Each structure stands twice: as structure tokens, then as C-alpha cells.
Amino acid sequence: MKKALKKSLYTAVLSTVMAMSITGYALAAEDFDDAEDMEFTLDSMVVTASRIPTKITDAKADISVITRKDIEQMHISSVEEALRTVPGVQFLNYGGNGGMNANMSGLRINGSKEIVVLVDGVRVNEFQGSDSGYFYAALTNNMDNVERVEVLRGSAGTLYGSGAKGGVINIITRKVNETKTSIDVSSGNFSTREYKLNTMGRQGKLGYNVYYDDKHSGDFKDGSGIEWKSDIDSTSAGLKLNYDITDNHKLTLSYDKTKAEFSGYDYIYHNNYSGHHDSYSLTFKDDITLSDKWSNSFTYRRSSTEGEYAQNNHSLFNADLSYTYDFISDQVTYLTNRHNVVFGVDYAAGKDDDAKEFTAHSGKYEHFKMKNTSYYVQDDWEIIPHVTLSGGLRHDRPSNSGQTGASIETHTSKSYKLSWDVTKKDNIYAGRSGFFILPSIYQITNKQYGNASLKPAFGRTSTIGYSRSFDDYNIFTFNWFETKTERGIGLTAAGYVNTKGLSRGWNAQFMTQLGEHWNANLGWSHLYQYEDEDTYSMGYSPKNLATFAVYYDYAKVKAGLDGYYFVRRVNDDYPDGWPVDNYAIFNMSASYAPTKNISIYAKANNIFDKMYSERTHVIYASGKPGDWYSMPGRSFVLGMQVNF
């Protein structure tokens, strides 16, 4: 069974990390130019909760924000690094093994790997199903181009479609309203080096943004001093053009490409591995404001992904995959004093470029393709002053072709929520939201583990929330949730099967400004989770996860300290499955700006050199203590950024 799961996981990584798609509505973030503006206050806007710009205190949702200031304070280099201190977010990473990791590896929100990732409101994962929470996209590598990252916890299936069970991550890029070029060079231990270029400018109605990132890392040591062989070279590049036809009519064209090559040694299977994964996406958007009440957003995206993973002596683990996707979305927004209405249609089509004709144990396939058309509507209605009733519907009509087997059923997801502004500072809400998850192309067509009869997953999440705004700079939120998976998708030795599951827990966070130069974010998440027939999940869930971040900013000096404390929910069947069940990770960063245009920085990750792991092989029959993929130990980076 372990080989079956391992093989499927290797292939799923390549098939899902690079899946890219869309969802219609995108809003550019406000551009912040000075330190005072970068502070996140109650007046700051978020868009992910309702697809409409809303103050964070009016969102009535379990949401967190990583701001531009947070990114700069900690010199955060990737979206994964930014998300590791967000309440309710978990990663299952293969240490520094490049062929088994992605930009965001094994990502979970509220215990679920079924999430939606957006860039400027546009999906970058589609037809992923319930694979492994892996995402691969160029824009997740270069944080110089990112204004903020919004994390919405909880099911959002009616607004964002298939896959939005655990939550939604929206990466919002910087708006082009100035001319600026940034060059960043850094180097550290583990043969780490990175070169980044980001340039933007505006000439009249035309704005542009170009970015390039080149990154290398080599062998690394874990917290116990053991060296792991690894070599990773990756590049990401992109171009975004904005053209303002009028103040109310804007066009955007963007192209993003990423390429990675990797090799190393798998100490669990005692074998060399090598491979690559490449992807690109081309996106066109047309946003128009028709009046003070009506607006429309149209999006088209084409993306292509290709990858290969190979182990020298284990052909069972080899994978060679290539997918192409097309996406069209149109959303209409209607706003009045008492109603915020969004409605629209999303269309997605994907095909397996390598699957010309073959017979798997689950069926016969020829030029396999998947399609899905979704129609949705949501209304936030202030029924009386301070009381809002929200309701939404999404109808999915999926289909596939080139398959001898069961057809995929249609589904309608529903959501509703009632919120009450008890006082000017206190808000409570309660609601329920359904989700619907299509199987991925890989889960259906894989020659060894695919299942032609695999049905979509569906279920619902119930939530109760409370928020307290002490003042403009101090916010507390608490959210309880329960997710019932009436039909899920799990992996066994025999292949993919439909399952059932339950997760329940809560998230709490406190965001505060400590005087003129300090600010902090604190979080605490608690989780119970169970899913039958999914042996892969055993022992991976956290029982409690505490997160923290403290930042200091004064004159030419910036500094930050962040991290998390992980308490594992131990599986009694595998008491020795991990090097440690409870651990704390601390990271720190400091920078000094001798001039306005130059910044010299240093950062240290895992500063106490903690030995820990997020992936284990011990739970399998042949596993033994020590058969886990260790995370890197203490690492250092020294860099310089020049702006002109």
C-alpha cells in the first residue's frame, strides 16, 4: 500500500501543482507608498469575503490579511512563507526535496486540502479535485509584485466554485501607478541564492509591470545535523499591461511563466530522483463600471502545465504529465444602499495532452477532456438597520468526453448567513455554505489508481463568528466551524474512492498596533478531523496551532519576529510516526536603509535549529522511526535591495 500511495502522491504532485484556472472578479489593491499608509486599519478594504470591496470589520467572515508592510518587514520571499503564520493554515512539506515540493506544498485550511487559490481574484487551480493541496504558479514566487494576501477560512463554494471547501487564498498584486525599479540579490547557507527584478511604470493611460526571479538551493541539513541531497533551480517571469480606456473602463493583459528543474536523493526509498515542472498562463481582463450601481468584469485565461518526475530504480514512481486549460468568466455586480448583488457565469475546460488513447483499470480513455459551466448569484441584504441576510446559489454542470464510464453529475450549492452589528464595535454572525468538488483529471484517468466511477465530493460547512473592534488598530475575531463531507474523495492502496468525513474546530486572532513603532498579530487554531478510507491522512492533523508575528519599524531600521507552535493530534496507531509531536519554530528578520533607495537585510529561519517533519513514511507497513522527510534546520540569508 505504501508504494501505491507514494506513487500516486508523486504523480499527483505533478498533475496538481501546476493546475491553473480562473474565477471572474478581480480588483487591484490600493498602492501604498509610505510607511504610514502601509498600516492595516479598520478602514482597509478586503475583497475575498464577498467579491466586493468591503472593510475588514464589515466582511462578517473568518479572514486574515498579510499586508505589504508584513511582507517587507520579514523580507518574505514566497506566498508559502507568508501563509505559515496565518491561523488555520497548515503545510505538509517534503523538507528541501525539490521534486516533491511545489510553490505551496500540501496546503490545508481548516484541515482541508480542497481550497481555491486566486491571483487578483482569478483562479490558479482548476480540475484539481482532492489531490494533495499542491499549487504551482509563477506569481507565488515573487513577492515584490504582491500588495497583500487575503485568506478566507471556511467553505465558499457558491462564490468561488469547485474546490472551495477549506477556504480561499487571494493574492493581490500591486497597482501600477508609479515608475519604479527594484533589484534584490541575496545569498545564504544551503547554497541558497536568489536574484529578483521588478520594474513598473505608467505613461498616460498605459501601465506596465515586469518581474523576473531566479532562485537556486542545494543540499541542506535538518535540525539533527543530517544532510539531505537536493538541487533546485527555478525561474519565474511575467509581464502585466494595464490600459485605462476611461476612468471607468480598464483592460489588463498578463503573461506569467515558471520553470523548475530538480534532482536529489530520496533517503526513504534510497534512490536518486530528477525532473522538472513548467507552466505558463495568459490572462485577459476587461473591467467596466457602468454606473454607481452596475459594473461588469470579464476574464479569459489559457494556461498550460507540463512536468516529469523520475526515480532511477523505481519506474513505479515515475510520472510524465501535460495539461492545457481554458477559462472564461463574466461577473455582474449591482450595489444599492441595502443590497450587494453579484451574479455571473464561469466556464472551464481542461484536457490531458498526453492521453491520446489508453485503457486504465478503471475504464477506456481517448482524448480525455473535462468541462464545467457554473452559474451563480449572491445577495447581501440589509433587511433592517444593522442586520444583514446573505444568500447564494451556484449550479455546476460538469461533463467529460473520451471516457468509457460513469458521467459526472450536476449539483447546486447553497449558502446563507445572518449577521448582526450588536454595537459599533461588536458583530456576530452564523451561517452555512455548501461545497462541490469535481474529481481531477488525474484521479479519473490515472492508469493505476484512477477511478472512472469516481463521483464529485459535496458537503457543507456551518459557522458561528464574532468580531470586536476595540479601536482603529486593534481587532479580535473568533470563528467556530463544522464541516461535514457527505461524499469526499480519498486515496487507498486500490486507488481513489469516495469517502465521508468530518472536521470541527475554531480560529481566533488578535491584530494590534503597539504604540507608534510596533504592531503584532496573534492567532490560535483548534482542529478535530476524521475521514474514512483516506489512510494517507493518518496522523497529519494538528490539534492546536498557535501563530504570532511582531514587527518594529523606526526611521531606517525594520525588524520582525514570527513563527508558530504546532501541537500534533497523535494517532494512537502510529505513536512513533514523527521525530517530535509538539514543536515551536521562530524566524527573524532585520534591515537597515542607509539611503532612501538602498536596504541591506538579514534573516534567519528556524533560529533554534529545531528538528521536525511535516511528512512521514513511518505510518506505512515497512516504515520505521527515522523514515520521515525532515524540514531544514537553521538557515541564514543576507541580501540587498536597490530601488530607483
Question: What are the language-model segments listed below?
Answer:
Residues 7-11, 23, 27-28, 43-45, ...:
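Conserved C-terminal beta-signal and adjacent last beta-strands/turns
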Residues 55, 80, 84-123:
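Extracytoplasmic beta-strand/coil segments of soluble accessory domains associated
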Residues 139-182:
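A beta-strand signature from Gram-negative outer-membrane beta-barrel systems
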Residues 244-259, 276-415, 419-423, 470-480, ...:
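Face-selective signature of the C-terminal outer-membrane beta-barrel domain
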